[in-house]
């Protein structure tokens, strides 16, 4: 088996599309953006903004990449479930609550914790599937 150093652009796109469709948020647009964070789900535009650091993905970055994409997909799922405006209000309320409790508005935010758990819990499943499909 040949070990590829980089994941092709086509394979990366196929993985993202598969994940979005599976979790029934296929209408989410994906765009690369220069940013400090790995990714961000822009609830106002319904766009998953992916850091340009993921323009090319090394095989050693697949775990981090899958966790990141799944994390942001969870936010998209919440926005679909509650409606984007209500989800944005709920998220901001949670941020303000954490600040009032002198906690970190991101790391202690229940929506971030749930999204991170989602990514951590499902990345292996998708890693196995994408390996079988020879996408990674």
Protein language model features and the residues they cover:
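Short acidic, low-complexity intrinsically disordered linear motifs used
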Residues: 1-7
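Zn2+-dependent metallopeptidase catalytic core
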Residues: 8-26
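Catalytic zinc-binding patch centered on the HExxH motif and its immediate surroundings
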Residues: 21-62
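Short, polar/charged, Gly/Pro-enriched helix-capping and turn/loop motifs at alpha-helix termini
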Residues: 26, 83-84, 129-133
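Post-HEXXH active-site segment of zinc metalloproteases
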Residues: 63-67, 79-113
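Short active-site segment of divalent metal-dependent hydrolases/proteases
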Residues: 70-78
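Long, well-structured alpha-helical subdomains associated
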Residues: 100-136
């Amino acid at each position: 088996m040949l070990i590829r150093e980089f994941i092709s652009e086509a394979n990366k796109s196929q993985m993202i599309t598969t994940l979005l469709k599976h979790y029934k948020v296929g209408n989410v647009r994906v765009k690369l953006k220069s940013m400090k964070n790995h990714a961000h789900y822009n609830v106002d535009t319904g766009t998953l903004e992916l850091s340009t650091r993921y323009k090319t993905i090394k095989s050693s970055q697949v775990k981090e990449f899958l966790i990141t994409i799944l994390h942001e997909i969870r936010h998209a799922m919440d926005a679909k479930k509650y409606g984007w405006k209500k989800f944005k209000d709920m998220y901001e309320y949670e941020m303000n609550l954490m600040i009032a409790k002198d906690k970190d508005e991101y790391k202690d935010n229940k929506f971030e914790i749930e999204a991170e758990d989602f990514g951590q819990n499902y990345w292996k499943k998708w890693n196995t599937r994408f390996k079988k499909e020879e996408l990674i």
